[in-house]
Design a protein with these regions (language model features):
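The feature captures the beta-strand-to-loop junction immediately N-terminal to the Walker
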Residues: 42-44, 336-338
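ABC ATPase C-loop
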Residues: 172-173, 450-451
Length: 517
């Protein structure tokens, strides 16, 4: 890739294979990125983007991580690899001082041993023996860049998905590495967060950082990149400037989502005939929820102190306030709102994972207070924002079938599991290890585990994250099919185009309150 400046990072990958005996996952691939430049690596699910990013970032070092035939070059030092025992070894810690990395799973970059956002940001600086005065200044500056100043005292475990991604980006840039690689950094961010991240990327590039963004979607700052590389099946399908590739054959960018392409492929969903004429499948009446000073959920019957905004006067945080919501069979409702608004918290009330401080949750007309979560889960299927939280079996088929034999018997369990895998396009992956699937397929697999039970209520937390165009079409078809069969669907999303297309109505959650959008 030609640049006017010498590259700060380069790679020539003749072949990269994992130790599982399979074929090459990357091959015939050359990458070079110069200081003060922005490169976008684009591709559909399974194209090799994440593998390339982890290899360049030192998170998948040749040798322990797999066999590389080719070279890696960083800040003028080239390491040659022949795929044998004589190859050099990369020290991930040393490499990481030069290359900041934000993985697709934002939580993986955190130390997990720090109790606040501020301490997590400072962790890398502490390891580099930065003085306290400089450390405090760097934490404040980085928090300001990423909209985290009001969250510096919060425990990372209580962050929303978008807030967690902002924190991961902050941890990667606070030490000012010359190279920054981010895998799907815009996932889970609200519109304001995406704009702020775009401004941050522009500022880093202007300051001389080499930025590489891996993405299955093109929008915003990626259109300003110096170069696009399009991957398919682990090799370069095309490369060039954004203008040149967008003006070329549509086949080059097939499957890569572009906002200008419009919303989802299914068109606007028809209003279900049952809406307003049947009893709600899900109903929330006056639901409020918050946390006590010690970070634990406030118990039912807890008396709130006088509120100031979204917080009580004694620092007990209120997340949901007086929520009234009814969703009928066959209805699709989208919930939007800024990061940290409480959208995931709202969904976790549907099956009793969280209990309201005040108010009532009814599923199919029955108050679920006091009912075990397991019994409610038969009627309420919840897709978590992070699909790995609900994947644990050895194969995709076992994952979907888990618990079905006991509920439906062996014959019906097998039929349901096979049908659910087919509904999300994963029949061919039935015997694959879930942990080895790309993030998009993990999300679809987690969805299949929910669909197989045919719940009365389907609650989906950020279901479009990490999906390419093909994956979005699969999701869209599955959601519409579930609604057509009578499920009440509630989906939380920052993908406003998809929300407008798929949902019968869209409601916004902000400052703990719901309003029709």
């Amino acid at each position: 890739v030609p640049y006017s400046a010498e590259p700060v990072m380069a790679a020539g990958i003749r072949e990269f294979t994992f130790h599982d005996g399979g074929g090459p996952v990357l091959q015939g691939l050359d990458v070079a990125v110069a200081p003060g430049s922005l490169m976008a690596v684009l591709g559909t699910s399974g194209s090799g983007k994440t593998t390339l990013g982890r290899l360049l970032a030192g998170w998948l070092p040749p040798g322990p991580g797999g066999n590389l035939i080719g070279f890696l070059e960083l800040t003028g030092t080239r390491l040659q690899f022949n795929g044998d025992a004589g190859d050099p070894r990369i020290d991930p810690a040393q490499w990481g001082r030069q290359v900041g990395f934000v993985p697709q799973d934002a939580g993986a970059v955190l130390s997990t041993v720090r109790a606040t956002v501020a301490e997590e940001l400072a962790f890398g600086l502490e390891n580099s023996a930065v003085g306290r005065t400089a450390m405090v200044a760097a934490v404040e500056q980085t928090a300001g860049l990423l909209g985290l100043r009001n969250l510096l005292g919060r425990h990372p475990a209580r962050l929303s998905g978008g807030q967690l991604r902002r924190l991961a980006i902050g941890c990667a840039i606070i030490t000012r590495p010359p190279v920054l690689i981010m895998d799907e950094p815009f996932a889970s961010l609200d519109a304001a967060g995406a704009r702020e991240l775009g401004d941050l990327v522009r500022g880093l590039v202007k300051a001389g950082t080499a930025v590489v963004i891996l993405s299955q979607m093109v929008d915003g700052v990626l259109r300003e990149a110096d170069n696009w590389i399009v991957l398919a099946d682990g090799t370069v399908k095309a490369s060039g400037t954004p203008a040149a590739l967008e003006a070329g054959s549509p086949a080059v960018l097939a499957g890569i989502r572009r906002i200008k392409d419009g919303p989802s492929p299914g068109g606007v969903a028809p209003v279900p005939r049952s809406a307003g004429h049947s009893a709600p499948a899900l109903e929330l009446r006056g639901v409020s929820f918050g946390y006590r000073k010690d970070g634990r959920p406030a118990r039912q019957g807890f008396t709130w102190q006088r509120r100031q905004g979204s917080r009580t006067t004694d620092n007990q945080s209120t997340v949901l306030q007086g929520i009234d919501l009814a969703v009928h069979p066959g209805e699709i409702v989208a919930v939007t709102g800024p990061n940290g608004a409480g959208k995931s918290t709202l969904l976790r009330h549907f099956n009793g994972l969280l209990r309201p401080t005040t108010g009532t949750v009814l599923v199919q007309g029955e108050d679920i207070s006091g009912k075990p979560v397991g019994s409610t889960a038969a009627a309420v299927g919840l897709l978590f924002q992070h699909p790995r939280e609900q994947l644990f079996e050895r194969t995709a088929l076992r994952e979907v079938r888990f618990g079905l034999d006991r509920l439906f018997g062996q014959d019906e369990a097998g039929e349901r599991a096979s049908a659910a895998l087919a509904a999300v396009g994963l029949s061919a992956a039935a015997h694959e290890q879930p942990a080895e699937l790309p993030a998009s397929r993990q999300r679809l697999l987690a969805l299949a585990t929910v669909l197989a039970r045919k719940p009365a209520v389907l609650a989906l937390d950020e279901p479009t994250v990490a999906l390419d165009g093909d994956g979005l079409a699969v999701l869209d078809a599955a959601v519409r099919s579930a609604a057509a069969e009578g499920a009440a669907v509630v989906l939380v999303t920052h993908d406003l185009g998809y929300a407008r297309s798929a949902a019968h109505r869209t409601i916004a959650l902000d400052a703990g309150r719901l309003a029709e959008a």
